[in-house]
From Swiss-Prot:
GO biological process, one term: methylation
EC nos: 2.1.1.279
Keywords: Methyltransferase, Phenylpropanoid metabolism, S-adenosyl-L-methionine, Transferase
Name of this chain's protein: Trans-anol O-methyltransferase 1
Chain positions recorded as S-adenosyl-L-methionine binding sites: G201, D224, D244, M245, R259
Length: 358
């Protein structure tokens, strides 16, 4: 064994215990603690655990102490803030009070803006968690972890059977997409001369709504499987269409694939792209919006997010993965597009355009 390094040991220990943080997060989200903090104290104020407990449906006298311990670990990771205040009751002169930060605001359930609470609920759903039990089996024997954990059903087949998981996925997309898309659309100007945009796999049209907000001249078609489309909200400038992208895609001047190809193998991605090729005019294009993997692992926050998402694809999808720019360009070539180009990247997303003509 290499020489002992205590700092390295403590870092390794923290990694082992890191699941305590997201475990606490999901508990507090389900208890609506972040919502209580927002409602009662806003972004600038603080609440004592006693005050939070008063807003929960509990008579447990230990609830404030338990909440304090849960909130304390989040404060140690700078997810929430903490300060010492005079206690409401009891013998201690000072005790801890907690407040929201720019990070923890994204765990408030009842807000119109971006929220990661549905995503955390999704990945902690028992039907998602059980994929971990099958990863090693998939590595050694082949196949896919989610399929093995669900009697052969793929993730997308399972969505048609479990409304709770399907709804969490749709909420996740609706609540998490706009933040990064709005940042990207400040740099990407590829829709300025386009009259009609088809968003393939658009769920509740979060991406298309962002595109139209930056390009109000655009007419939008939101295309997804029927069980998703039937719950999609009515939105100005957007027509919802149900169908199967492996069979056909609605015709449009530009077709958007936002976070779609990462769900599928290379072979299936090529099939999707071929259907898109058939649906665009000679002057049309396919706009791929995805997280872009680097060729070598990097340790900045965006690269870490992308690598972590790649593991989610390994867990849940039938062969999906995050790809590099060169891998996307190769998929376009295999699908018959004679010309393609990486356009730009901003925040988590990058854009690759595929053209029907050179």
């Amino acid at each position: 064994m290499a020489s002992h390094d205590q700092e390295a040991f403590l870092t390794a220990m923290q990694i082992v215990n890191s699941s305590a943080v997201d475990g606490v997060l999901i508990c507090l989200i389900e208890l609506n603690v972040f919502d209580i903090m927002m409602q009662k104290a806003g972004m600038d104020g603080y609440l004592h655990p006693d005050e939070i407990a008063l807003n929960l449906p509990t008579k447990n006298p230990q609830a404030p102490e338990m909440l304090d311990r849960m909130l304390r670990i989040l404060a140690s990771h700078s997810i929430i803030k903490c300060k010492l205040v005079k206690k409401m009751s009891g013998n201690a002169l000072l005790t801890r009070a907690y407040g929201l930060t720019l990070i923890s605001q994204y765990f408030v359930n009842a807000q119109d803006g971006p929220c990661l609470a549905p995503y955390l609920k999704l990945i902690h759903h028992k039907q998602m968690q059980n994929s971990w039990e099958k990863v090693n089996e998939a590595v050694l024997e082949g196949g896919y972890a989610f399929n093995k954990a669900h009697a052969g059903s793929t993730f997308f087949e399972y969505l048609g059977k479990d409304k709770s998981v399907a709804e969490l996925l749709s909420q996740t997309m609706a609540k998490s997409i706009p933040t990064s898309m709005n940042i990207l659309l400040k740099s990407y100007k590829g829709f300025e001369g386009v009259k009609e945009v088809v968003d393939v796999g658009g769920a509740y049209a979060a991406t298309l709504s962002c595109i139209i907000s930056f390009n109000p001249h655009v007419k939008g078609i939101n295309f997804d499987v029927p069980h998703v489309i039937k719950n999609a909200p009515s939105l100005p400038g957007i027509t919802h269409v149900g169908g199967d992208m492996f069979e056909s895609v609605p015709r449009g001047e530009a077709i958007v694939l936002q976070r779609v190809l990462h769900d599928w193998t290379d072979e299936e991605s090529v099939k999707i792209l071929k259907k898109c090729y058939e649906a665009i005019p000679d002057h049309g294009k396919v706009v791929i919006i995805e997280m872009i993997q680097t060729e070598m692992p990097e340790d900045d926050i965006i690269a870490k997010n992308i690598s972590e998402m790649d593991i989610r694809m390994l867990l849940y999808t039938p062969g999906g993965k995050e790809r590099t720019v060169n891998e996307f360009l190769m998929l376009g070539k295999q699908a018959g597009f004679p010309s393609s180009k990486y356009i730009c990247g901003a925040d988590l997303y990058g854009v690759v355009e595929l053209y029907k003509k050179k």
